[in-house]
C-alpha cells in the first residue's frame, strides 16, 4: 500500500509543477486531450494501470466464478432436461402400455360377447327344436286320438244310424225292415258324406 501511495505522489509531481507554473502557455481545445500537459499523461498512465488491474482482477477472480456459476447452471439445466426427457419417455411408455391393455380388454370383451351370443343362439335353437319336436309329437298324438275318437264315433254312429233308421221305418210303415238292408243303406249314406 505504501509503495502505491509513493508511486502516486511521485507520478503526480511533474503535473503539479506544470500546473503551478504561471508561465505555462494556455492551450486551446479540451484540456483532457492536451498531452503536452504532464498531468494529462499521468492521468492516462494511471487510468491504464487501473484498467489493467480491473482486467486482471476480473479475469483471474470474478470471471472464473461467473463462469463456474454459468457452467453449474448449464449442468443443472441439462440434468433437468435429461430427467424431463426420461420422465416423458416413461410416461409415453405407460400410456402405450395402457392403450395396449385397453385394446386387449376390448378384444377379449368382444370375443366373450360373441361367445355368449353364439351360445345363447345355439341354446335357443336347441330349445326351439326340442319344443318343435315336442309339439309335433303332441300334434301327432292329438291327431291319432282324434282319428281314433272319430273312428269310434263313426262306428257308434253307424250303429245309432242303423237303429234310428230301423225305428223310423218301423214307425212310419209299421213294418220292421231287414237288418242287412238298413246297414247297407246307412253305409252308402255315410260313405257319400265322408
From Swiss-Prot:
The chain crosses the membrane at residues 1-21. Keywords: ATP synthesis, Cell inner membrane, Cell membrane, CF(0), Hydrogen ion transport, Ion transport, Membrane, Transmembrane, Transmembrane helix, Transport. The keyword Phosphoprotein does not apply. InterPro entries: ATP_synth_b/b'su_bac/chlpt, ATP_synthase_B_chain. One of its GO terms (cellular component) is proton-transporting ATP synthase complex. It holds the Pfam family ATP-synt_B. Signal peptide: none annotated. The keyword Transport applies. It is a single-pass membrane protein. One of its GO terms (molecular function) is proton-transporting ATPase activity, rotational mechanism. It is found in: Cell inner membrane. F(1)F(0) ATP synthase produces ATP from ADP in the presence of a proton or sodium gradient. F-type ATPases consist of two structural domains, F(1) containing the extramembraneous catalytic core and F(0) containing the membrane proton channel, linked together by a central stalk and a peripheral stalk. During catalysis, ATP synthesis in the catalytic domain of F(1) is coupled via a rotary mechanism of the central stalk subunits to proton translocation. PANTHER family: ATP SYNTHASE SUBUNIT B, ATP SYNTHASE SUBUNIT B', CHLOROPLASTIC. Belongs to the ATPase B chain family. F-type ATPases have 2 components, F(1) - the catalytic core - and F(0) - the membrane proton channel. F(1) has five subunits: alpha(3), beta(3), gamma(1), delta(1), epsilon(1). F(0) has three main subunits: a(1), b(2) and c(10-14). The alpha and beta chains form an alternating ring which encloses part of the gamma chain. F(1) is attached to F(0) by a central stalk formed by the gamma and epsilon chains, while a peripheral stalk is formed by the delta and b chains. This is ATP synthase subunit b 1. It comes from Granulibacter bethesdensis (strain ATCC BAA-1260 / CGDNIH1).
